[in-house]
Amino acid sequence: MSRLEIDKVSVNYGGRGGAQTLALSQVNLTMERGDFVVALGASGCGKTTLLSCIAGFMQPSEGEIRLDGKPVLGPGAERGVVFQKHALMPWLNVADNVALGLRLRGVNRAERLRIAHEKLAQVGLEKVASKPVYQLSGGMQQRVGIARALANDPEVMLMDEPLGALDALTRESIQALILRLWAREQKIVFFITHSVEEALFLATRLIVMTPSPGRIAHSYDLPFARRYIECGDARAVKSDPEFIRYREEIVDLIHATP
């Protein structure tokens, strides 16, 4: 079973004149297969820094991150990343964008295109596989980014505000898509957002982080993602009195967190 461990992780950024900025301080977090963990907090609380450490884009100043007992020392195919900006290659068509990671790993063309078409079908884009990515809407481009991350069959999906630039209706549609994919794949998901409602809807566990330095101030185990999978009605889930109570509590908590 996949297991991601964040063990006493701190990150210092160096500044001019040798000044140090403590971005993360003594963060401890364990995630296992099927966990959907959402990090929420004010700007500057270290959410993206933490995701970058998990992805292997940077190393902690202190502490260690382990996946299945092995230290994370750099990027790897077992960790897929979806960014706020889709980061697609404009000179490649949709299918070749999805297959890019497989190509870099040496997978033959027939097999990587088979996988690309399979993942595009999962995100509802099988009919646009041959189109240039610049012809797609923002929401469709982000779905291509999700399909590309899934193509390598990672153990962990890292999602850094992937829906932040989308309109409200598209955002809700892709929230539901992400949950359906999570329910089917049962991967570890670590997701960053500034939206309290989005965090409550997606998370099986929600962590609220303090700003400067970033620490985990509160953690909530939540039922709403699984409720959506059971009923398929996002509006019913989000209008439930329990959902609204959590939303108000967490908004108050974020405003009160120093």
From Swiss-Prot:
It is a peripheral membrane protein. ATP binds at residues 41-48. This is Taurine import ATP-binding protein TauB. Keywords: ATP-binding, Cell inner membrane, Cell membrane, Membrane, Nucleotide-binding, Translocase, Transport. GO terms for cellular component: plasma membrane. Part of the ABC transporter complex TauABC involved in taurine import. Responsible for energy coupling to the transport system. One of its GO terms (molecular function) is ATP binding. Its EC number is 7.6.2.7. It comes from Cupriavidus pinatubonensis (strain JMP 134 / LMG 1197) (Cupriavidus necator (strain JMP 134)). It is an enzyme of class 7 (translocase). Signal peptide: none annotated. Its main location: membrane. It is found in: Cell inner membrane. Gene3D superfamilies: P-loop containing nucleotide triphosphate hydrolases (3.40.50.300). Belongs to the ABC transporter superfamily. Taurine importer (TC 3.A.1.17.1) family. InterPro entries: AAA+_ATPase, ABC_transporter-like_ATP-bd, ABC_transporter-like_CS, ABC_transporter_ATP-bind, P-loop_NTPase.
